[in-house]
């Protein structure tokens, strides 16, 4: 029983350590939405095909929702608070233009 508790404790700690509160990534002023996505997002959001970057829900299929998610992150997604202004707009436009809606 002690071994099970130890394994569970170590597993929980590993999961918590993996949860990052935010990234300090700041895109170049002239970075395209695709470049920002490739650098900041594609490590977790692998493109599904040549023309589909990811699948998003209908509730996320708008620019404001995407930008809010990028800034705040979630339990499973790192926040990117330094993707601001025009760069955030370009990223959101890229995601919308290259995603399928579920």
Segments predicted by a language model, with ranges:
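Gly/Gly-Pro-rich "capping" loops immediately C-terminal to redox-active cysteine motifs
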Residues: 28-38, 43-78
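C-terminal motif of bacterial Sec signal peptides marking the signal peptidase cleavage site
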Residues: 15-18
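Bacterial signal peptide processing site
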Residues: 20-22
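Sec-dependent N-terminal signal peptides
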Residues: 7-13
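C-terminal capping alpha-helices of c-type cytochrome domains
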Residues: 81-102
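Bacterial N-terminal signal peptides that target proteins for export
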Residues: 1-7
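Alpha-helix boundary/capping residues
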Residues: 11, 40, 73, 95-98
């Amino acid at each position: 029983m002690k071994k099970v508790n130890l394994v569970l404790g170590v597993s929980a700690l590993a999961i918590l350590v993996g949860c990052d509160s935010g990234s300090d990534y700041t895109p170049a002023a002239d970075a395209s939405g695709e470049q920002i996505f490739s650098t900041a997002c594609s490590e977790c959001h692998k493109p599904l095909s040549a023309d589909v970057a990811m699948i998003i829900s209908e509730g996320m299929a708008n620019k404001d929702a995407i930008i809010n998610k990028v800034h705040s992150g979630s339990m499973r997604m790192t926040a990117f608070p330094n993707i601001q202004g025009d760069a955030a707009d370009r990223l959101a436009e890229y995601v919308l233009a290259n995603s399928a809606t579920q």
